[in-house]
Amino acid sequence: MREYRFDVKRCFTPENVVRLLFVCGCILRIWYAVVTPVTMRGHDIWELSVNAKGKAAYLLRLVEWGKLPDSYELQFYQQPFYYLLSALAAAVMRGLTGIEDAAFLVNAGKVVSCIASCFCLYLSERLLREFCPVRVRGYGMAVLSFTPVFWLTGGRLGEDALTFFFMAAVILGTVEWEKQSDWKHTIWLAVLYGCGMMTKISLAFPAFYTAYIFWKNRKSSRFIPKMAVFAVIALPLGLWYSVRNFVLFGQPLGYVPSMGEILYRGDRSYVARFLSLDIRNWLRSPYANPFQDYNFPVYLLKSELFGEFTYDMPVFIPTLLLLFSTLLTLCVAGIGIYKIYRWKSAPGEKRPLIWGLLFGGYAAISYWKLPYGCSMDFRYYMMLTVCKVLVLCCFLDEEPEGHFAQEQLLLQKGLKGLCFLFTGFSILFFVML
């Protein structure tokens, strides 16, 4: 009988490690979505009734009445694509089980968020594959698989996870269009933008980067017809609901409901809100507070991990998790600033830096236009983590050279260690929920 010997090196190759991390990330997202009721750590769910005006009512009206909202009050202003998909999932579950309870139907709608979150992880890995060799992709996948904001949004009713999916999809689609600008890629990218804007109008923001890539390739064959077809597909798909509400109810284009004085932060200076790092707030608590906090950088650091919620667990776990995440983010930000300063001579891929500036600018503009505590929530800006991971992995792939080769090598080792610590404490945080 042939003796079987387990070969660790052959089993845990870099490719297999990336696959394992992807599977673990998906399992974590699915598990969280299954065990967490829709009313826990949700946003704007409100009553589980067709007579309410929250996200649950939006879904239930589609399932039970088969029609879109008849006003733009409160959460009914939201774009419909996520709720149409969630209503379809809830209707299928009702047909399979015969259960018509409102809580069951709303919980069933979370399936779309969970699936979108898993596909987001896949698209993020695809972006890593575009720019980084497999030997460093495992560090990025560890961060992406276990960063709490991803599985938190994947386990709740709302358009955040699906919005992130389309954000990643249009960026990846633009990268692929740049390599092959044929009709298939043009039409596919237009559909992604249209469905993305039908999920959240903010999907129009990455179009600035896509337009830049289009303009760079304007000498390619049949450029004008392709752009015309792109617009004919993307704009009607993305804007029909806004036009419908404008015509039927007079809803202003780009409308966002008032969030109330209790969340208003516009009375603080721009320096306090944007241009400083509030260390005192960072030290006070690992959790963000939308009713008190106003410092944008610190709020992003906290809400990337914990959203707008607090958790019943030993405080050292979220505190150390925040510490490791902050160190990782600050190091990557420093690397990015150096590469921007040495733009022409700095080695490595520049596109993740451009995306980081784009999405960072979008986040800052959003908080500037809507100076409310909840406008800083990281669930709106999850592409920033993907950009951070891309810059990180590109740096880890660089061969140290020059006068500071030893320092660069030491920094690379330190960042790898931070990835391990961050991953370990993210898993511990999940286990302690």
Model-derived regions: residue spans:
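Perimembrane helix-loop-helix junctions
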Residues: 4, 173-179, 206-235
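Short helix- or helix-capping micro-motifs
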Residues: 25-28, 140-145, 172, 193, ...
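Extracytosolic helix-loop segments that constitute the early lumenal/periplasmic catalytic or substrate-binding loops
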Residues: 30-42, 46-77, 81, 89-97, ...
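Transmembrane-helix signature of polytopic, membrane-embedded enzymes
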Residues: 96-104, 124-146, 164-165
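Membrane-interface anchor segments at the N-terminal boundary of transmembrane helices
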Residues: 104-115, 286-363, 386
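Membrane-interface transmembrane helices that cradle and orient dolichyl/undecaprenyl
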Residues: 130-134, 170-188, 196, 215
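Short acidic/glycine- and proline-prone juxtamembrane loop motifs at membrane-interface regions
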Residues: 149-163
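Membrane-lumen/periplasm interface segments of specific transmembrane helices
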Residues: 225-332
